[in-house]
Curated annotation (Swiss-Prot):
The keyword Plastid applies. One of its GO terms (cellular component) is photosystem I. Pfam families: PSI_8. This is Photosystem I reaction center subunit VIII.
């Protein structure tokens, strides 16, 4: 049962967390290198 439910939990988790981390790192990178 756990092995059957694991992908259904991991797929949305990876699908939501990975883009969030990518967007946050990109945002911080842009903020750090922004020239005023």
């Amino acid at each position: 049962m756990i092995t059957l439910n694991l992908p259904s939990i991991l797929v949305p988790l990876v699908g939501l967390v990975f883009p969030a981390i990518a967007m946050a790192s990109l945002f911080l990178h842009v903020q750090k290198n922004k020239i005023f």
